[in-house]
């Protein structure tokens, strides 16, 4: 796959925007801050993770600004979708793709960026319009469906839907694919996971995990290991409730 990806922390430091790019073109997942995105199109990157202050301070070559081919949005919450209108106005040739605005996608839809295929997975639960985007069989941009050793709150769905989402992802996604999350909640989620079992130091040092690592260590993938009684759906629901309370502590 002849493209690179950077992740930009915006919105106070825990929202991720993901920009896939080569020398002359790019596509983005979740334009949380469209001004940062537009500036990033003209920057030569030296690492894989930046915060928005770093992007603001970097030099930009407007003559070599990359063409923004697609803007994919994982769900309608404004901390992920706020940039759609601005990008549509500033970059009218950009194709905006989501489950709720612009070009409405459905599960199984595929788009091409150069020689890279991007497949849409409908993953309703956090919201009814939640999608993950599978990029070149190497990355899965998950929005708030899956997070580092966690998953999103069930605002628009049921525990059964999250179980189904996880099983579909396990079945359809390369287990060596890297998950690109919608937020950096890694520290909190590590602490929560260690209420049930130990998380190795090499996992704690990472910001993004492979699917195989999530399968092994994410408690929402391991419902039989969390010492909660009930059916599979009941355990998923109780685990999510316990995580909600943990987040407020």
Swiss-Prot record:
The UniProt record lists the keyword rRNA processing: no
Record key words, sorted: Cytoplasm, Hydrolase, Metal-binding, Nucleus, Zinc
GO molecular function, one term: metal ion binding
Cellular location(s): Cytoplasm; Nucleus
Cofactor(s) needed: Zn(2+)
Cofactor note as given: Binds 2 Zn(2+) ions per subunit.
Gene Ontology cellular component annotations, sorted alphabetically: cytoplasm; nucleus
Domain of life: Eukaryota
EC number: 3.1.2.6
Pathway as given in its UniProt record: Secondary metabolite metabolism; methylglyoxal degradation; (R)-lactate from methylglyoxal: step 2/2
Catalytic activity: an S-(2-hydroxyacyl)glutathione + H2O = a 2-hydroxy carboxylate + glutathione + H(+)
Binding sites annotated in the UniProt record for Zn(2+) 1: 75, 77, 126, 144
Binding residue positions for Zn(2+) 2: 79-80, 144, 183
Residues at which substrate binds: 183-185, 240-243
Family membership noted in the UniProt record: Belongs to the metallo-beta-lactamase superfamily. Glyoxalase II family.
Function comment: Thiolesterase that catalyzes the hydrolysis of S-D-lactoyl-glutathione to form glutathione and D-lactic acid.
Descriptive protein name: Probable hydroxyacylglutathione hydrolase ECU02_0580
Lineage: Eukaryota, Fungi, Fungi incertae sedis, Microsporidia, Unikaryonidae
């Amino acid at each position: 796959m002849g493209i690179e990806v950077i992740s930009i922390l915006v919105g106070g430091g825990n929202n991720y925007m993901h920009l896939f790019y080569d020398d002359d073109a790019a596509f983005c997942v979740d334009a949380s801050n469209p001004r940062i995105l537009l500036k990033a199109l003209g920057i030569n990157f030296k690492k894989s993770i930046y915060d928005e202050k770093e992007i603001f301070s970097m030099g930009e070559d407007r003559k070599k600004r990359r063409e923004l081919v697609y803007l994919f949005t994982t769900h309608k919450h404004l901390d992920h979708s706020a940039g759609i209108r601005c990008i549509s106005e500033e970059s009218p040739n950009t194709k905006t793709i989501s489950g709720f605005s612009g070009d409405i996608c459905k599960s199984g839809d595929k788009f091409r960026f150069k020689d890279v295929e991007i497949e849409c997975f409908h993953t309703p639960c956090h919201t009814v319009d939640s999608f993950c985007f599978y990029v070149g069989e190497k990355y899965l941009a998950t929005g708030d469906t899956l997070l580092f050793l966690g998953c999103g709150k069930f605002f628009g769905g049921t525990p059964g839907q999250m179980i189904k989402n996880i099983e579909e992802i396990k079945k359809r996604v390369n287990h060596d694919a890297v998950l690109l999350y919608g937020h950096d909640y890694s520290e909190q989620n590590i602490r929560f996971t260690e209420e049930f079992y130990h998380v190795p130091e090499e996992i704690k040092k990472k910001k993004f995990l492979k699917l195989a690592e999530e399968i092994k260590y994410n408690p929402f993938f391991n419902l039989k290991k969390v010492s909660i009684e009930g059916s599979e759906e009941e355990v998923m629901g109780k685990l999510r409730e316990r995580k909600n309370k943990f987040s407020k502590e």
